[in-house]
From Swiss-Prot:
It is found in: Nucleus. One of its GO terms (biological process) is regulation of gene expression. The modification Phosphoserine is found at residue 354. A zinc finger (C2H2-type) spans 103-127, 164-186, 363-385, 391-413, 453-475, 543-566, 601-623, 629-651, 657-679, 685-707, 744-767, 1331-1354, 1388-1411, 1446-1469, 1514-1537, 1608-1630, 1636-1658, 1664-1686, 1692-1715, 1721-1743, 1749-1771. PROSITE patterns: ZINC_FINGER_C2H2_1, ZINC_FINGER_C2H2_2. The lineage of its organism: Eukaryota, Metazoa, Chordata, Craniata, Vertebrata. Residues 294-357, 819-888, 1103-1177, 1795-1843 are annotated as: Disordered. Residues 330-340, 837-846 have a biased composition (Basic and acidic residues). May be involved in transcriptional regulation. There is a cross-link at residues 794, 1353, 1402, 1747 (Glycyl lysine isopeptide (Lys-Gly) (interchain with G-Cter in SUMO2)). This is Zinc finger protein 142. Residues 318-329 have a biased composition (Acidic residues). It comes from Mus musculus (Mouse). One of its GO terms (molecular function) is zinc ion binding.
Amino acid sequence: MTDPVLASQLANGTGEMDGLCSELLLIPPPLSNHGILGPVQNTCASGELAPLPADPGCLLVEATATEEGPGNMEIIVEAVTGTLSPGAPEETSGVLVKVVEVYFCERCEQSFAEPTLLSVHQCTETHIQAVQDLSSPPCSVELPPSNLALRGPLQDPSLPDSPLPCPVCRQEFVQPQALKSHFKIHRVTPNMFSCPESGCVFSAEDRKGLQNHLRQTHKAVPVPCSFRGCSLLFGSQQGMELHRQAHYPFHCSHCSFMGSNVKLFRQHQRSHGASARGELSAAVQGLPSQELLPAAKLPPGHREPSEEASTPLPGQESAEEEDAEEEESVTQKDSQKVMDKSQGAQQLEGHVGSGTESLFKTHMCPECKRCFKKRTHLVEHLHLHFPDPSLQCPNCQKFFTSKSKLKTHLLRELGEKAHRCPLCHYSAVERNALNRHMASMHEDISNFYSDTYACPVCREEFRLSQALKEHLKSHTAAAAAEPLPLHCFQEGCTYVAPDRKAFLKHLKEIHGVRAVECRHHSCPMLFATAEAMEAHHKSHYAFHCPHCDFACSNKHLFRKHKKQGHPGSEELRCTFCPFATFNPVAYQDHVGKMHAYEKIHQCSECNFATAHKRVLIRHMLLHTGEKPHKCELCDFTCRDVSYLSKHMLTHSNTKDYMCTECGYVTKWKHYLSVHMRKHAGDLRYQCNQCSYRCHRADQLSSHKLRHQGKSLMCEVCAFACKRKYELQKHMASQHHPGTPAPLYPCRYCSYQSRHKQALLSHENCKHTHLREFHCALCDYRTFSNTTLFFHKRKVHGYMPGDQVWQFCNASQELEGARQCLAPPSDSGPSSQLSAQPEREDREHEIVANSNMDQALPETNEEASPKRQDGIEAPQEDDQVDSPSLGEVEEGGCTLHLEALRVELEPETEPLPLEELTETATVEFRPLDPSGPLGTERPGGLEEPALSSFDSIETPALVAEEEPVVEKLASEPPRNPLISEEAPNTFKAALTAETVPLPPFPESESLLKAMRRQDKEQAEALVLEGRVQMVVIQGEGRAFRCPHCPFITRREKALTLHSKSGCQGRREPLLCPECGASFKQQRGLSTHMMKKCPVLLKKNKALPKPVSPTLHPQLPDNQASQDAESRKPPPLPSKVELLLPKDAPSDLPGGPGVEEPLPTPSDFPTSPPENSLPTGTSEKFHFEQGKFHCSSCTFLCSRLSSITSHVTEGCRGGRGQKRKRGRPQTHAVVLPLNNGDSTLLNTGSTESSPSDGDTAVVQKQKGALFSCPTCPFSCQQERTLRTHQTQGCPLKSGDLHCGLCPFTAPAAAALRLHQKRRHPTASPASGPRPLLQCGDCGFTCKQSRCLQQHRRLKHEGVKPHQCPFCDFSTTRRYRLEAHQSRHTGVGRIPCSSCPQTFGTNSKLRLHQLRVHDKTPTHFCPLCDYSGYLRHDITRHVNSCHQGTPSFSCTQCEAQFSSETALKQHALRRHPEPTPPSSGCPVEVTEGPLHCSHCGLLCPSPASLRGHTRKQHPRLECGACQESFPNRPALDEHRRQHHFSHRCQLCSFAARERVGLVKHYLEQHEESSTAPSDGDAGQPSLCCPFCDFACRHQLVLDHHVKGHGGTRLYKCTDCAYSTKNRQKITWHSRIHTGEKPYHCHLCAYACADPSRLKYHMRIHKEERKYLCPECGYKCKWVNQLKYHMTKHTGLKPYQCPECEYCTNRADALRVHRETRHREARAFMCEQCGKAFKTRFLLRTHLRKHSEAKPYVCNVCHRAFRWAAGLRHHALTHTDRHPFFCRLCSYKAKQKFQVVKHVRRHHPDQADPNQGVGKDPTTPTVHLHDVKLEDPSPPAPPAPSTGPEG
């Protein structure tokens, strides 16, 4: 039907439009079908002007025609490239032209209002022009349905991947969201309401006026659109229904269903089934157009399309809440967006006006001046102005502002809905959508919406907004169903009308007034004034603000209103700008957004202010002292999570930051940044008093202390120092405040130190030699970096930070570093690693770091047990040790060495070297001291460092890490121990990376260590005041040993102690002559035969000097012949490395033979008269790795020692050198520059005709080279060059003292020095007289040596005594070898078996006898063979001494005893052992094999002997516990039998009594004397007598003698115990600490017994069996509880009621739930509180989606264990439950209860009618539950006899 009025308007307005904008003439067609959904074709007559093509620069998109007049035509034109201006003003009478921006598609030339719509647009093959206007004024007449026919066949939208067509323009879209976004362009809100009746030109500005016009003029009832947000009126219901379809983007192709909810639309499509899909195309094409209109009769199951068709029912609210956003004022929002775009970006709240930017210090957008509270918000906002290509969707090319939004968008496009509802089939992309679904669909499950909404009529509260709206409809429907009589509201009028028309007529006729109707579409109420109507109209809104008059029906608007806050009574003014407001919410929002950089967060406790709220929260913790963040691996706590994340790196072994220059690796990025300053030369910190510069602030702070005075002073002795750590060390060493600093013993000798760094330096210098330091300017080498620093400062004049020195010597240092980095040219296949000189830092600082040294004394008390354990056992990798000083000092300033204990790790078997070289090609490189040591693979990859040390968390950057370099290849042994351990260390270090980790981290040794720590922690709890220790009198008497401090409560134990264990009753063996004491008879006999001084005096006829030579003397001629024929011994490679590079290699004596040359550092720098004589080198020679003195038997391994010996202390040359033959050694001839040769003779001797004996051939004398500036002289030019290169200590003109190294610039100073220091000095006149022993012929030059000789040889004094037992000896090396039996330190392992030895000689003898089995000495009288000469001597003395009376019948051997003959027969003529009587004869067909090593033995007896000797059963002699290998036994002895150690010295004892005795004898006596230092330490007094002491262990032992004992009481409760471990475990109940963790699950507990009890869960063993029914369980408590089911016993009764139970925990739960009101356990997700933790855990399962209980038959999952047990009965035929009143049976109990209630209602208690078949076995959960498909963890190893 055509509207003539509108057609005439368009016809008349065509010319005006042409004149207005002739360039943009796009003639619209006559709107004959205005208001109808359908495409509009642009047609024009042939005689008229042809329309212009759609220019991309200017495209007419929308045209809205109104019916008021020809001049009110609004044209909306969107211009992309330019702006359009209207024509002449006179031609545009009343015409409005609005120019906005447009986005168009270049392919189909379709335009869009927003770029997002263009991004989701998909072009079709045919050009489709958009509809000009969708919401034009509708008409009330019957509309032809042909205009609504679908254009073309529709694709099946029921398929998941089928496109969705737009119902207006038929454009297809893949995604529903794209269709909905596109559908918005068809909606426009009308500005004028026109009359829908034909021929009527009435229009009104408001809807009410049109409604009154229709009723009064046309007598028609207006039908409003039932869609929310649409204000249009229609003349008939059919027109309204037809229009309402235009509001829904989704239309069903099978029926008239439509909607805007994607989920409901998909569900409706699935309801048609798959059969309708195949007939879709034909059905749509042949579908009559009337099907789209509402029919009178609909098919069954379909309801009339109404508001309910698109609005979900209560409980069906959309997850995305699309209906609430689109159906409620959606057209108003869209039009507002268009208006915003047309008018430009408006200035929103919080934006900064131009010119006022300086007032605000905040996160401000530079483009739109918008402000944000956080920088992250600004960064996300900037993506709007500057799109990030990485945040662009690859499918629709749409840009996003964050990765999370892009991820959500991609998930929506892919249709992946990861969040699923556990109660229904709903799924969503986002978690919030699922929460909204749970709140709307499952009200009682989720508490996502915490708001409540009250009904404005009856004040009833609702949790869901939709429920409130439905409730409001009931009030409206009730008012409409029962209309109340209408009373006249005029004063004095009592008229009452039951009819609405009569009431209106009465008001109009009688009072002349007009009633105001309620604006609500379904409310019939009338009011006298508009104000009363408006007040009533608010009652139709669902949401009312309680603080103001605001009311609305949109929940989101209501929430937005509440967030905006309400004005208060006080005006709030901003302190940074003129802003003022009464609204506190607006004020906080303004300050947070506009002044984010200002310090707006003030501390209420102090004056602290900050710009960040997180910083304020962290600052407030300073006042409270709380540290909420705690490390799970140690006791570290901090205030901020960022500190914790940095601290966690200390527990990690990964070092991700590596320096590319030197290989330095670290865990912290900042450390690497600071380290890189060295390579860049960035010495940013400079001293203001000198030229010192460095790259670290802490180094500068330490340096500045040099220029300051000693500001710190000791209060006790007035000791002054500069650094705090120096004062702390002084107090610890001198005055012992509290616990003294622990002693760090050396692992290889008896050296001890209270400073760990000194110990590490000692071990490196004396024993390990793992790191060697080289001077880059000369050939100086040392094993101490401090000594290297002193060398550079003394010889080369180096000072840290001296720029002049660095500039002059930089090139030399670099050259020396390159030479050191170059690999050795003569490296053989063994690839020996030579130590590399360390590149010294230019800012090298000798002063130790004050921060670390300051921290060390604080941790001494805590770390002392760990350090002691670290001495005894290897540290685990995952344990954090004490601060690694190697990591603290950087660049080689300090050295931290940890010796690897390979023999203490039996689980890591080292690979053989052959397998190691086959499996991985390892390239040995020169060591870099500044980087880690690693192995390089062929691909260039670098393996992790073999040895590194973890650092602990420090508050500031105090140091950088420095990895420790281990020696991988064995060098010529400086120390035999190191040469033996180096290969094993290397193998173990490499295989530690390849061998898989043990299956569980909680080893038995770790648990024992934690138990010991728990015992020691009890003392700390006493000091903290959390535990009170009291002494109580025990029951019974105590028995004390009269000879020692042993005390016991059992008389039998005292008797046993007196017989065997008392050390005081053992009487020593005394020598009758001199009184020396011995423990064994053999020692006494040896002493009386050879060493007793009294017997030696009696038996001495003439004084004969005792020759200390080990070998027998040879005749002189034989000695000379041997000397002439002896070949020069080969030199070790260690001596070869000492040669300088310019030394010639073609020396006499054969290739490869090089003699060690004494360097100037080995000789004392003295004047010529005291320097080394010319013939010094003749007096010693080098043989078999040792330097031998040619005049006596002295030998050593160092060149400096032999030089000092032959120069000063050799006494053999004076009286014995002519009686002793000396071997001949070759001389080394070095060519000089002048062509001569200087013969350096190292002890060569020849027979001279002028001397009968061996004489010394005079050395060929050459020219002496002298230093021009000092008295130094030498015979070789190279030595002089080295002396000058190192730096002469004297300057030209300095004078040198001849008696000491003193130098002076003037002669007067030298004379004064000699007068003071050497007043009686006179030139030496001949040798000093020798001192001679009066008891023997011993002579020496020093009185100290003579005194020591008398004490050792004649007085029997043994100065070296073992601290662990009574062993004493005269030799220190014997003591060290003996102590290794106790400590295990220094033991030399055998490479073929796990045995260890204290000396190399015993190791060699062991290898000869056990492994090689090749005897070297033979008895000449029989077949006996041995491995030492002493074996043959002992055999001859015992078996062949005297007259041989026993002869062998099978050979000619004769013996002096029958026992020797039997041994010979068993050894030489073995016979098979006859079988014993009564035993079957063993038939042995061939040799017997050893099960351990596979050795073939001829007889069982030999096999038993072999097993007893070669594979002994290692058993502890104290506790008879057996071990698989020697290291395990040593570890056991160390841990258990020497576990009592003195805290003041290195003493250790097996039993506590020995330690008590040691304290009484050594420390208590010395501490009883009063002193100033001990005045502050109170004595410990006995509560029963006057005894006092200073050590708690002594007091405990004394109190035990009174029969008393200690009792520990908890201060928080009434718990008390005598056990220290138990009080520690109990205290954790109050603190919540749970250090014991299960390695198979997340279980943690406070004591190890609970952990052991818990570990049975992971085992399948069920060792407790019920004798009645065969029930098996894992715990005895389970069995006890089960037995009560058979006995019916319920011993636990509630004291407050009659409740009884058979379980104590059930009674506890009953009392907590029934008789307590406190609900201490709260759910963090929903806020519900519970009385017990079990109920809370049960409740938490509701929030989780996990269903851990899976049936092993059908794989059905259950959330509860009971559900699985009940379900398991469905797979069986058993019916265990039956009715006692009839024959009914069931599988579950509740079924029988339900049966009794239904069929036996007379039964009072239905549970009494339920019975259970006792023959039916109980369904156990482990029998029906499906186990985890992952491989089970290996069972934990047995921990002892308990299992």
